[in-house]
């Protein structure tokens, strides 16, 4: 399990190493947007390429051992806004949101208590309250209100009017001594200044003021296409990549002559105007998705749902995510989307939370999306699929080989649906940024290793799976003389067309090792005095620290073996 780590410290490490930067940091940054540095962009690119290779170019056989047919798509970020009307996003893609009248900030209503748990003022105040026993010390709370509280939560009722607020709390405790207040009840009391008039209030995580009522707020970013900024020119940045696939379903079918079952895959940016972006890159306003829409016969859709659910969990494990940290969870009836027949969230136990958080959703979407676009586009026939192979295979006993003529005989609907139907869709939808964060968290390790004198020292090592590691190998000349730099440069240039490799001849070799450990490089290759004698080099393994001598001609093969897919 990833240890609980300070995310601010972790974010600084990621910045210092060139994994992730705050976007436009020189101007104070912008909440919910992140940039990937030199190491981060390679890590994320490797993740996307591994996904494309394993799921699109070379997916494993299907449930019955059949070959899976997959193609790719790259859709526009801005589409005709009617797409989002048909999909239901314009009407329903919103979050319950509460605005603070004190500081003007917004908070997700359904995540209030989780956000409060991360609040600076709340964590400071909890030093004066025991959430297990419900006990507190009034003089200490008064001191906090007149001291730290003034700076951390200036609009909290306890800070503005501590005598009144504490009197409400004392009345509650004295009235029910056998049932001490819970943490949530305590928090509501310290946020309440006029109990009779307002009842218990809930505080703003930023300033402590009582929050307003919850309202549904659209999460879609709006813009305009063209120079006229009118209602007719309004467009949206896509909040998901899936709808572009559904809108192009018929185009793909006609241009590729694919037969069911088949999948359409897409990697691309999506945008959601999140109310409270938080937890580093986990909840961002701009993010990248890796999605598949897999189209199949309705009668076969359940087995395909189970296939993709199991395959996607296994894929994460093959790339270095410990099984104990992966938590597949079937969504309950109260949380599954109204159109979904079933959804499994593949969750990961991030170190910033006590509860697993979603990495990917595998949804059985039924025929909902194609049905919606068939209805709203007025082109219903384009979203139907005619199974010609099955029709021809069942020709025995029919009086006609024409499906149109057969339809004139008014066959039962169940018979028609064997040959002509709206396909069901299984959707494995993964977050490239969330998986990148999970890989960073999983890889981050501090351990003890011997230094040059044999004494133990602490090192930070990023234990990336070799397929995902930003740098596959680093090449060092042991010293900058005796022909070693020339041989090291030659090996570097020989490997560079095949892998992302790094050349370093600065400083002691031990320090060079440490720098590559922090970058997550699986192999360090050193050219030394023996290289000139027998054409061998030492290859150091990042995780075991073991070194072995290998022929220069075999170095490429050693690296390639470590990069072989394992799904």
Task: State where each predicted segment sits.
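NTP/phosphate- and nucleic-acid-binding module
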Residues: 1-567
């Amino acid at each position: 399990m990833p240890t609980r780590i300070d995310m601010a410290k972790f974010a600084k490490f990621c910045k210092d190493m060139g994994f992730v930067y705050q976007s436009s940091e020189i101007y104070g940054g912008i909440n919910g947007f992140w940039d990937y540095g030199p190491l981060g962009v390679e890590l994320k690119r490797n993740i996307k390429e591994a996904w494309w290779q394993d799921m699109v170019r070379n997916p494993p056989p299907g449930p019955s051992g059949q070959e899976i047919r997959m193609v790719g798509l790259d859709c526009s970020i801005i589409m005709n806004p009617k797409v989002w009307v048909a999909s239901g996003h314009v009407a329903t893609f919103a979050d319950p949101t509460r605005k603070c009248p004190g500081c003007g900030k917004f908070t997700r209503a359904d995540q209030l208590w989780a956000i409060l748990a991360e609040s600076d003022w709340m964590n400071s105040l909890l030093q004066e309250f025991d959430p297990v026993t419900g006990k507190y010390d009034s003089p200490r709370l008064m001191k906090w209100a007149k001291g730290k509280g003034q700076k951390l939560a200036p609009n909290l009722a306890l800070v503005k009017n501590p005598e009144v607020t504490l009197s409400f709390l004392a009345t509650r405790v004295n009235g029910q001594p056998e049932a001490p207040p819970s943490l949530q009840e305590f928090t509501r009391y310290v946020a309440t200044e006029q109990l009779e008039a307002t009842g218990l209030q809930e505080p703003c995580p930023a300033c402590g003021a009582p929050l307003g009522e919850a309202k549904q707020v659209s999460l879609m970013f709006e813009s305009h296409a063209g120079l006229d900024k009118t209602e007719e020119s309004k467009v949206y940045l896509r909040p998901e990549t899936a709808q572009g696939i559904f809108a192009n379903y018929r185009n793909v079918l006609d241009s590729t002559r694919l037969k069911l079952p088949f999948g359409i895959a897409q990697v691309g940016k999506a945008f959601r105007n999140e109310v409270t972006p938080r937890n580093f890159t986990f909840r961002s306003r701009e993010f990248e998705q890796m999605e598949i829409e897999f189209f199949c016969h309705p009668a076969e859709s359940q087995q395909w749902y189970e296939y993709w659910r199991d395959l996607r969990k296994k894929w994460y494990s093959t790339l270095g995510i410990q099984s104990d940290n992966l938590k597949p969870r079937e969504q309950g009836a109260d949380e599954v989307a109204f159109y979904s027949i079933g959804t499994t969230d593949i969750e990961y136990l991030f170190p910033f939370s006590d509860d697993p958080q979603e990495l990917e959703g595998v949804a059985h979407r039924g025929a909902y999306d194609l049905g919606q676009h068939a209805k709203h586009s007025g082109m219903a026939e384009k979203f139907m699929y005619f199974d010609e192979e099955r029709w021809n295979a069942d020709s025995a006993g029919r009086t006609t080989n024409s499906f149109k003529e057969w339809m004139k005989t008014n066959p039962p609907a169940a018979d028609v649906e064997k040959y002509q139907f709206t396909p069901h869709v299984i959707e494995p939808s993964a977050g490239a940024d969330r998986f990148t964060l999970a890989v960073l968290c999983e890889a981050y390790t501090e351990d003890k290793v011997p230094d040059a004198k044999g004494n133990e020292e602490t090192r930070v090592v990023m234990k990336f799976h070799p397929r995902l590691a930003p740098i596959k190998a680093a090449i060092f000349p042991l010293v900058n003389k005796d022909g070693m730099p020339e041989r090291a440069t030659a090996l570097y240039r020989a490997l560079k067309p095949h892998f992302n490799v790094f050349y370093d001849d600065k400083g002691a070799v031990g320090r060079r090792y440490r720098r590559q450990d922090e970058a997550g490089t699986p192999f360090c290759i050193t050219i030394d005095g023996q290289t000139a004698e027998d054409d061998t080099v030492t290859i150091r393994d990042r995780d075991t620290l073991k070194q072995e001598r290998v022929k220069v001609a075999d170095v490429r093969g050693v690296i390639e073996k470590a990069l072989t897919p394992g799904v």
